[in-house]
Amino acid sequence: RMRLGETYLIAAEAAGRKGDYDLAATYVNKVRERAAWHEGEVKVPQFYTIEGGVNDTHSTYDAIKVTEAQLRNTDFVEFMLDERGRELLGETCRWEDLVRTEKFYEWVKTFNPDATGLKEFHKLRPIPQTHIDRLSPAGVITEEQNEGYY
């Protein structure tokens, strides 16, 4: 299942990778505009504590807008990974994002120091043995299974 926010982020990443940071910022800001507190919106008490004010009903959108210059002057892929992480939290696409951007090994080792058994080949998952058993004619295991799992 795909949401509109994810579609905007895919378009933003595609635009940014092509060097069109202005269009990328437009798409990212569409997502951020939806997520921002809007003028006059009632905020939960926990937000007041973090924000430091009571009955503060101003919009937060201007404070979270991203500009073309910000995208141009940052590691764009890492920026998009962070943005996707916030927007798509819990939607089970983080592994695919990290593998697709070739950041899987680096990020897991950085943010999960207890993952001592992690190897580069873990970016690929093992092909189920039941699938391999059904192949006809049967091939050599090194040709049928992803590297590291044989």
Describe each PLM feature range.
Residues 1, 32, 45-150:
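Long, intrinsically disordered, low-complexity segments
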Residues 1-34, 77-87:
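Extended, hydrophobic/aromatic-rich amphipathic alpha-helical segments that build helical scaffolds
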Residues 23, 40, 89-92:
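Acidic/polar loop patches that form or flank catalytic/metal-binding clefts of enzymes
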Residues 37-43:
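Boundary/linker segments of alpha-helical solenoid repeat arrays
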